[in-house]
Each structure stands twice: as C-alpha cells, then as structure tokens.
C-alpha cells in the first residue's frame, strides 16, 4: 500500500515537471541546431542551410535568426509565443517584400544574360535549388527563395513588374506602421520637420553667400581701379602690393645635373682609351648556331634556282680590319657652371604667378625644367580656368619676364598643365659627343641611330632613321640646318661600317658636304650639279626596284628579312652572297633642285618616300626655303618626320610642321622635332659639331678604308643640247613664254604677227633647248623653266 502511494507521487511529480522541461529541451535543441546551421558544421549544418535556402534563398539567415528567437522564447517563457501579434506581422511583411525584391533583381540579371531556360519563376527557382544540391551550398544564386518566387509570380501575374515593385514598397510601409504602431502622419511628421529645418539652413547659407559675394565683387572692383591707376605710373608698383603673397617654391629640374663630365673624368677616359681603335658602338659577333640541315638545304636550293634574280651591285664584303671611330675624336663638352640660375628661376616663377593674378587667372607654377637654351615652367591652372586665357597672355608674360619671346605649350601632353618656355639668359652649348655618350645610345645593333641634341629636361634625343623612315629638315639661313645634317652623318659614320650603310649626298651649294668626298660609305662622289641630282635620284629609284625584285625571288618582305636569309645561306653554302646595306640619301638644298627640275625631282622623291622604307633606303631632305612650291603637299604627305629650325613667319612654320611654333625659336640649333606618330613637336637644342671635328672623323674613316664608288650609281654628264637660233624673235619669244607660263604656236602668231611656219620653228627651238616640253595634242606645251631661271641664264 505504501509502495503504491509512493509510485503515484512520483508519477504526479513527473506529470507536473514535464511541460517546462519539454519547452527548455526544445528551445536548447533549436538553438544548437541554429548555431550548427550558421557555421555549416557537418552534414546536418549543410542540410539545414539547404532547407532554409529553399524557402528564403540568399536571405536564409533571416529564417535561422527567427528560429533562434523562437528557441530563446521557449527557454525563457516556457511556452508558445504569440506569432501573430501586430509587430511580428509587420516584420513578416517587410521580409516578404525583401525576398520579392531580391527575386526580381535575380531574374532581371538572368534574363539579360539569357540564362533563364523556363518562363515559370517557380519552376526556375526549383531547378536552381536542385542544381545547388548537386554542387553544394552557396554555389547558385537563389534570390529570395521559394517565398520570394511565390510573391514575385503572384504580383507579376496580377500587376506586372512595375506593379510588383509598388506592392513591395506598400508592404514595407505597412510593416513599418505595424512595428511602430503609428499611422502615416505620425511617421512622416519627423521627416517633414527635418526637411523643413534643412531648407531653412540652406536658405540662410545662400543669403550669407550672396552677401559675401557682393562684398567681394565690390572689393575686387576697387582693387582693379587702384591697380590700373598704379600700372599707368610705373610697372614696379604692380608687384609691390603683392609682396605678401606666399608662393610655394617650384621644383627645379636642371639639365646640368645629368653631366658627370669634368677634367679628371676626361683624363681617365684618355688613359683607358690610349688608341683610337676601339669604339662603344662595336658589337661582339654572337656565336652563330648551326642551322638545321633541312632549312639549309632549302635555302641553298632556292638560291640555286633563282635564275631570274637580277645581279647584285653591292659586291664589297666586310672589311675585317675596319675599326669604328672612338668618341675621343669628338671634343669633350665644357663644364656647365651654375651660379645664381636657381634664384633667377624662382624670381621668374614669382613674376609669372603675379602676372596671372593681376589678370584674374588662378594658376600656380609647380615645376620648372631648365634646359640648355630655354626653361620650361609647368603651370597648373585652377578648375574653371580656360587654357585659351593663358595662351592669350603670351605677350603680357613676355613683357613681365623681359623675355625676347616665349612659347606656350597648351597643354603638355600627358599632363594637366600648361608649359611656358622662356629663353635662358645664356645658352649652354650641347655637343654631339655628350649626346652619343648617353645611355640612350647604348644600342650598337642600331646602325641608323642618329643623335639630334638634348630636350628641355636635359635628356639626350636620339632617333632611329629606319623607323622614321624619312626626315625633312627646314629652316631659315643660319638657324643650324647644316650643323644638324653634319651631326646626322657623323652619327652614322661613328656607328656603321661601309658594308652596313651606304650614303648618297646631293649638295647643290657645293660647300657643305664636299668634306665627305672619299668616305668609304659613299656610293658616288658628292653630287653638286643640280642637273645630275635628278639623275642620281632616279638611279636610287632603280636600285629600290632591284631590291624589291630580290625580295620577291627570296620570299622576304624587307631588308632585315633578306639579310637574315643571306646569313643562313652563307652558313650553309661555300658561295657567299653579300648582304644589302642601308642607303641614306641626303639632299642639302631641295629648293635649288626644285628650281632646275621640279617634276623629275618631285617624282623621284615621291616614289622613294612611298616605297623605299622596306628596301632600306631612307631620305634626309634639307631646305632653307620652306614654301609650298618647294615642300609640296606630295612630299609632306610621305615624309611624316620633320625638324623645323627658326623661321621668319608662322606661315613657314605651318608649311613645315602643319602648325605654328617654329617662328618663336631662338636659332643657333634651337629646333622643333616631330617624329612619326607624335601628336606635338618636341623642343630640342641641337648638338653642335665643329668643322674640325668633322674633318677628324672623315680623316680617320678614310684612313681605315678607301672609297669604292659604284659605277652604276654615278650620274652621267648631261649633254648640253642648246643650239644657237638665228631668228631674232627667239629671245623675245622665250621671254613671253616664261612670263605667260604657257606656249603654243597660235599664241606666238598672235603676239608677233608671224606666220605658222616661223612660229612653229620657234616652238621647236624652245623644245630643243629645254624651254618647253614636248607636244601633247590639244593641250598647251608645259614650260620647263620659270622667270628666275631665265634671268639667271
């Protein structure tokens, strides 16, 4: 009886404790599973992640957090919470809106990429979920899950996509109202108060700004009136009131810092190079690898089968004893002494900024580059300052700096700055030796690398002639053209052996290039007769055509490929074939050639400029008369690389560079160099080369090897076909034809009142003496000379 009573007490106690333990156990279990799900621990964690992602998609963490909140409620309250109270309903509405927005965004992206295979949103979401089950959690984007898919499908079917967005926004607003337990007016009232207060603050700030601006404009007008009155009395008074302006010192880049040259280094170099038989341009021959047998056999067979190939004209082979000239032949540059140049640069920078301020231009000098002849000030304008306003102040800036002339580069390529180039008080000489001794010249394999000078930053400027591929040099008399041409020729002589580069020089002035007669690099003696010049150019055209025939027979495309082809053949065959050298044609005065035989010269130059690059033939044309009848449009179109020295007018500058700037150069080697592909020209101080240095280089080269001229390239004497004409009207007829620049028998009949027979004899005599061209049917005959030539003859 006692035992039965004890069992009943225990059962009763078990029945009274069970509900509380049940909720605590369920709460702790749900909490543990939620943590495992968040951390994705094991198979259980990953499975629950997939479960929640199926319903909530990428927002599955909301479902997990909801389970955590439910577990905490079980443990604390030990009972079921009210899941349908007003605040929770508001939370549900916001979550549904978020899931729907997420699903709309997902399907817009999938539709744009064409990744949607099924038009049903629910089916597509289910397919994506099954795909994720295969690949693993977080491998596929599920948007808002199945809840989001149901919401999106329903709203899209009823209201379209825009209506779905509107429904989502309404759900968010209703959710906020349910959570806050307020109506719309109470919720929006704080927002309205904030907007109203911000508007009042902005209104007050605008009134203050307007009053301040009015005061500044009034003060500015007073300052402008006082400044104008002071400027009328004395210029110094403009600067005095601005002495209190704090100007940050600009960064000065001096080109003389790149010069390690001094007398001790000169002596050290002389000790190291005791004899003039070594050169920094001599390249060591790389070891020749034995080509494969099959390739060699093909080359030999192809060369043996070339029965139609034209014969080689350049038969001279490499002279193993030839030594390139050393740099010691050229003079060492003098040390550049820097005294108070930095102080002058700082003062000029202050003057520039003061001048800008006096004209109402907000700009600041931030960096200065001192070059050999000019100093470049980099000016950074403030936002809203027009570049054209700075360019328009060029004369005022020159007046403030007391400069001869200034050049404005607006803007500097690659920088948001304007460059103002001011001439130096003293021009520092740049020698060819220091240019060739720079690091940029450390390319012994480049046989056509020529030295030009130094730019404004002090860097050596060298150019590859084979990349240009032709060069036009123009400028007024005494501006430095001849020195530039000599520097180019000496650069080639210092780098290339006679079998590598050949030269043809045309010098109608007879004094500039005659010093190079006897150089082994010459194809012919220097051509000084203008009538022979056109013949020489035609021979170069014939050589170009012959080379293209060689390229066609050998299956190559340019001179580099052909020479590599010949090297492989010579390694495999005993019958050696010479390589093709580069040919550089130098014309020192184009204007004189155009006067004598304009049509022939222009046609030859046009053909060479258009086609000669691949054949290894390059033109360097110089002229001191940059007019459109000398530098024609055809020549300019085919010679993109140009050098402009100082000219007298902007028209001449446009003829050379297709733009202004050369009229503001200083002369004495100051040039604008625009290589092929450049958007703007580069200002360069040309390298100086004395006549004594040229003679020493020529003597050394001639001492290494004597000249072997190519007979086929030497122009023949032009026979004088002029004959004396007995008719007393001949001279008057020639003068009339030259003045009218047209010739016909009928014109002579009308003007001189003669018969047809006599007028026809006069025309025939003019044709025989080279005054007019041949008969061209109904067209008038071409007049071959102009008024200037007729007077000179």
Curated annotation (Swiss-Prot):
Cross-referenced SUPFAM superfamilies: P-loop containing nucleoside triphosphate hydrolases (SSF52540), Winged helix' DNA-binding domain (SSF46785)
GO cellular component: plasma membrane
Residues annotated for ATP binding in this entry: 478-483
Pfam families per record: FtsK_alpha, FtsK_gamma, FtsK_SpoIIIE
Signal peptide positions on this chain: none
Region (Disordered) location: 212-235
UniProt cross-references to Gene3D superfamilies, sorted A to Z: 3.30.980.40, P-loop containing nucleotide triphosphate hydrolases, Winged helix-like DNA-binding domain superfamily/Winged helix DNA-binding domain
Segments of skewed composition (Basic and acidic residues): 212-221
PROSITE patterns per UniProt: FTSK
SMART domains on file: AAA (SM00382), Ftsk_gamma (SM00843)
Cytoplasmic side: 178-793
Membrane topology field: Multi-pass membrane protein
Location within or outside the cell: Cell membrane
GO terms, molecular function: ATP binding; ATP hydrolysis activity; DNA binding
UniProt KW keywords: ATP-binding, Cell cycle, Cell division, Cell membrane, Chromosome partition, DNA-binding, Membrane, Nucleotide-binding, Transmembrane, Transmembrane helix
Family statement drawn from the similarity comment of this UniProt entry: Belongs to the FtsK/SpoIIIE/SftA family.
Stated role: Essential cell division protein that coordinates cell division and chromosome segregation. The N-terminus is involved in assembly of the cell-division machinery. The C-terminus functions as a DNA motor that moves dsDNA in an ATP-dependent manner towards the dif recombination site, which is located within the replication terminus region. Required for activation of the Xer recombinase, allowing activation of chromosome unlinking by recombination.
Protein name, UniProt field: DNA translocase FtsK
